[in-house]
């Protein structure tokens, strides 16, 4: 039994949109405009430039996914290029980043929905956590039903997101194309230019809004014709996202003044309240809709990383066993349980900021591994080969995203992030020394196979074919 290659170009594109289009477009424009010194052309240029940088980085990852078209390809690739310890470190980072991030997103969805019924006062904690748990476990069930079910859900989610952004983009042209709106752009070039430090901060803010394309590398083993589908989807998909982000920002600037954007907690909600004041209540549901797809993609991504690590012997074999729907059900359940703990003990969700540095470190390690294998194994079949300067550009971008916050505003949090990374190496040493003595997992695996009706999957080398 193996994971099914069931995703074509359409469903892969929908998953990419679902993972990439998030609530960042509702919040980030405020910070970008602020760091751009209220200079509209500079602000829009940063959004466009970061879109191009995102395509560059995504195409580098596409070479990894097409050379090793497996689920959890990033882990498999790092282990073979930089060694087991580095691969385990990436696993350590993703483990915490996924379950803390998923828990935080579920809580945010629940808070947005329940807040509609408690206007003027904060939403109560107990109903919020109960709804968050219900949402989380519902997505866990969807993930366990197989990649086809996940794809159809993300298709619906993507259509909602694309419809909302198209509505925001086109409303200015159809409804609010008045002289007073257009006049705000007439003197845009007269604003002062930001300094290099401010531009760096703005780029850092926008970069978070383009995260999500790595989901295709994680599910490469379930994509039909990955050598053609992945590069094509990344180029067209991120280009569409970039255009939508630009049009949405122009719409914000046409309806709201720069000062209104700067002082808004959520630019998207403020825009909605200004343009459609009679349906203000729908804003919270739209924010929730933008997060639903991210939660679904997060669970799938995390379970595939568990699956790959299990096949490589880092985790017990139970995590790589598949159910009747060709899904690693135990890995799905494990992620949902860990995320449930994060929701119940909501205070630990704030730890997610300590693993943010690790996400950029993983991308840096992948680029170094890609560069290394280019020179050590130049004859490996590469269905898609990215232009070499793109790899160096991605390395420079990762270094920029890692060190800019440390240089601009050093804090104790950065020390905690480094300690977190070193803890990963400590856990690797413990895992390497205790793995051979943990015979109790064999008995547990047998019982779990009967309980969940799961069976072992094929060797990763066989799945590449």
Swiss-Prot record:
A Pfam family per the record: AA_permease_2
Transmembrane domains' residue ranges: 7-27, 40-60, 82-102, 133-153, 155-175, 203-223, 235-255, 281-301, 328-351, 357-375, 387-407, 410-430
Induction behaviour: Expression in spleen is up-regulated in response to anemia.
GO annotations of cellular component type: apical plasma membrane; basal plasma membrane; cytoplasm; plasma membrane
Principal location: membrane
Spans within the Cytoplasmic topological domain: 1-6, 61-81, 154, 224-234, 302-327, 376-386, 431-465
Entry keyword annotation includes Repeat: no
Keyword Glycoprotein: no
GO biological process, one term: amino acid transport
Subcellular location: Apical cell membrane; Basal cell membrane; Cytoplasm
Keywords for this protein: Amino-acid transport, Cell membrane, Cytoplasm, Disulfide bond, Membrane, Transmembrane, Transmembrane helix, Transport
Extracellular-side segments: 28-39, 103-132, 176-202, 256-280, 352-356, 408-409
Quaternary structure and partners: Probably forms multimers, perhaps with an unknown protein(s).
Function: Probably mediates sodium- and chloride-independent uptake of neutral amino acids.
Extra remark: Inactive as a transporter when expressed alone or co-expressed with SLC3A1 or SLC3A2. Functional as a transporter when fused (via the C-terminus) with SLC3A1 or SLC3A2.
Similarity-based family: Belongs to the amino acid-polyamine-organocation (APC) superfamily.
Protein name as it appears in the record: Solute carrier family 7 member 12
Organism encoding this protein: Mus musculus (Mouse)
